[in-house]
Structures are given as C-alpha cells and as structure tokens.
From Swiss-Prot:
An example molecular function term from Gene Ontology annotations: sodium:proton antiporter activity
Membrane topology, from the record: Multi-pass membrane protein
A Pfam family hit: Na_H_antiport_1
Protein name stated in the entry: Na(+)/H(+) antiporter NhaA
Keywords: Antiport, Cell inner membrane, Cell membrane, Ion transport, Membrane, Sodium, Sodium transport, Transmembrane, Transmembrane helix, Transport
Coiled-coil intervals, chain numbering: none
Source organism of this protein record: Actinobacillus pleuropneumoniae serotype 3 (strain JL03)
Transmembrane stretches, start-end: 11-31, 59-79, 95-115, 125-145, 155-175, 177-197, 203-220, 254-274, 296-316, 328-348, 365-385
C-alpha cells in the first residue's frame, strides 16, 4: 500500500488529481448531512497570542491567509528563478508568454465586466477569471505527457508564472483594506532586513523563517493581504550563497511537495464546498456565476491566443520552436482552469460583504463550472493537436 502511495505521489498528474478529489469531497460534505460539521469546522476560532499581540481568526482564514502565504513563498521563488535563470531570463524567452499572459488577464476581466456592467454589487469580482491554476493545468498536461512537446510545457509554465505575478499585483493594488501605519512600519523594517540578508547572501533559512514570520504577521495586521508577505519572502531567498550553496533551490524543492499535496488540496477542500440548497437555474445563469464561467471558458482562451497571434503577426514575438499555434490554442483553453487561484481572489472580492455567503457561493459555482468545462475541452484539444500525425503535418 505504501509503495502504491509513493508511486502515485511521483506522478506529474498527482497534484491535479488530488486537487480535483479535494474539491469533490468539499462538495459532498457541503451538500449532505455532513454540511453542518463541514461549515462549523471551517468557522472554528483559532487564536495565537504573544504578549499583547494576538491573531484570532476562523480556521478558514488561517488556511487562506496563513497556509496560502507558504504557497506564495513558493510562487515568489519560482518567479525569481525563472526571471534570473529560466524561461523568463531574456527578452526573447519572456516576450511570447508575457504577451499571452497579458491577454489572458485583460480579456477575461472585460468579459466579466461586460456581463456584470448592470450589476454594481458584483463588479468587484472582475479579477476572478484572470487567474490560472498552474497545478491543475499541469496535471491535465501530465495526463498526455508522452505526446506533449517539452516546449509547450515550458510555455504553459512561463505563462502561468507571469499570470501569478499579475494576480499578485492585482491583489496588492485592489484588495487591500484600511492601512495600519504601525504595522506597515514593522513590515517595512522586516523587508529591509530580508533584502539585506539577500544582498549579503545569508543562507541560513531559519533567519528567513524568523524575519518572514514577523513580516507575515505585520502585513496581516496592516490591511495589506498577508499572502503578499509570502511573495516578498520568496523573492528574498538567495539563488546562490557565498560558498556556492543554492538555498532557493533547496527550499523550493522542500516546499513544493507540501504545497502540492497538503496546502493546495486543503485550500481546495476549505473553499470549494458550495451548498446547492436553494440554487436554481436562474441563479446559475445570473451575472456573477455567468461572468466568472464565461470569463474562464471564453475570455481566457480568446485573450491568450489572440494576443499571442497578434504578437507573432506584428513580429513582436515568435512561436517557440517545436510547437504550433493550434497547440497554443489548446493551452489557452487549459488556462481557463482558474480553480484555486480564482477561489482565492473570489474570497478577497466578496469575503467581506454582508451577503458574502450567498454571493461567494455564486462566485465559486461560476469558478467550478468554468474550470470543469475548460479542463474537459482543453484536454481533448491538447490530445488532438499533439497527436504524432498532426505534429508531423505541422
């Protein structure tokens, strides 16, 4: 049994499968006799006190603000590595996925806005369909890994990383609350220390853990979303130490399995549980879920492919060697898998509203519908466009 579990965890598609199972379990818990247990568990108050300082939040918020900050440390490190050494380390490498990612952020937001232009109570959800769930999308690609060109995987990874960077900027600019200057001052001091540690190539990760925890707590109290602390910590981990060590590489490899097999599935289980009680076709077709779903199903592929095609047409970028535009379109459809990142932004957009439960439930249903359709269509398009016979013809 243990060998079978270890074999499963080594599969490229394992993290995507686990996310799907976690979401399905959440839906089962939320729509059966277990619903009271599920929702009351997520609202269990958990407090941490240190002298006069205290953080007292429901378990759901600890998952979204705490554990997800660890995931964003990983995101920060991935972005840094790709910018300095990887698929985004030069203009020629970065421009094609960057333009594609830009389209994949702008068009879904416009689709959502167009559908919700007469519903002012829903308009703050415009950023929800901008996101791509890289773990889920790569999980789908991994199901066809033997026939998918390596360059196509690199394109998806680079696009998703830039997409994450865009989501981080959106969160920082549009989803921060009233600021606490005292907390921001402490956060600023922590950032200066982290930057100095990076500058002088301090490689002891315990130092980053201590200062990073102070940064996270102060950012949480400041009104800026706490997960941004994770990104800053990730960026401040040195690529190389004075003696040739690779702290970023080591920490990235240490955190990746925890994020893939614990944090993201826990986030999916905590956020995907939507009660369908009282739901009707009218509600499902209302502007909020419709805007989110169509933003992911139509906005994402149109944005990614259109911007890519125009960039090639104008000579701004070139299609990476070994892949073609048909395959780019298949990947563009897979980018409509918003899932965990879209759920995260939905919680920021509607989590503070008085009617948050019903509104947030509608947003999450839109995400689940859009993600499911994008995953199914994207899988079959990728399977068709990467067939060996078609690859030779291209």
């Amino acid at each position: 049994m243990l060998k079978q579990i270890q074999k499963f965890l080594k599969l490229e598609a394992a993290s995507g499968i686990l996310l799907l199972v976690s979401a399905l379990l959440a839906m089962i818990f939320a729509n059966t006799d277990l619903n009271q247990l599920y929702f009351s568990f997520l609202q269990t108050e958990v407090a941490i006190k240190f002298g006069a300082f205290s953080i007292d939040k429901p378990l759901l918020m600890w998952v979204n603000d705490g554990f997800m900050a660890v995931f964003f440390i990983l995101v920060g490190m991935e972005v840094k590595r790709e910018l300095f050494e990887g698929s985004l380390s030069s203009y020629q490498k970065a421009i094609f996925p960057a333009v594609a990612a830009l389209g994949g952020m702008i068009i879904p937001a416009l689709v959502y806005w167009f559908i919700n232009q007469n519903s002012p109570e829903y308009q703050q959800g415009w950023a929800i369909p901008m996101a791509t769930d890289i773990a889920f999308a790569l999980g789908i690609v991994a199901l066809l890994s033997k026939q998918v060109p390596p360059a196509l995987k690199v394109f998806l990874l680079a696009l998703a990383i830039i997409d994450d960077l865009g989501a981080i900027i959106v969160i920082a600019l549009f989803f921060s609350h009233e600021m606490s200057m005292q907390a921001l001052t402490i956060a600023s001091i922590a950032i200066v220390i982290l930057v100095a540690m990076n500058r002088y190539k301090v490689t002891g990760l315990i130092n980053y853990a201590i200062i990073g925890t102070i940064l996270w707590a102060s950012v949480l109290k400041s009104g800026v979303h706490a997960t941004l602390a994770g990104v800053i910590i990730g960026f401040c981990i040195p690529l190389r130490g004075k003696n040739g060590e690779a702290p970023l590489h080591h920490l990235e490899h240490a955190l990746a399995p925890w994020c893939s097999f614990a944090i993201l599935p826990l986030f999916a289980f905590s956020n995907a549980g939507v009660s369908l009680e009282g739901m009707s076709l009218d509600k499902l077709a209302s502007p909020l879920p419709l805007g989110v779903a169509l933003g992911l199903i139509i906005g994402k592929p149109v944005g990614v492919f259109l911007f890519s095609y125009v960039a090639v047409l104008l000579g701004i970028a070139k299609v990476p060697e070994g892949i073609n535009l048909k395959q780019i379109f298949a990947i563009a459809v897979l980018c409509g898998i918003g899932f965990t990142m879209s759920m995260f932004i939905a919680g920021l957009a509607f989590g503070e509203e008085d009617a948050s439960e019903s509104v947030l439930a509608l947003a999450r249903l839109g995400i689940l519908m859009g993600t499911f359709v994008a995953a199914i269509i994207g899988y079959f398009l990728l399977k068709i466009t990467t067939k060996p016979s078609l690859m030779k013809a291209a």
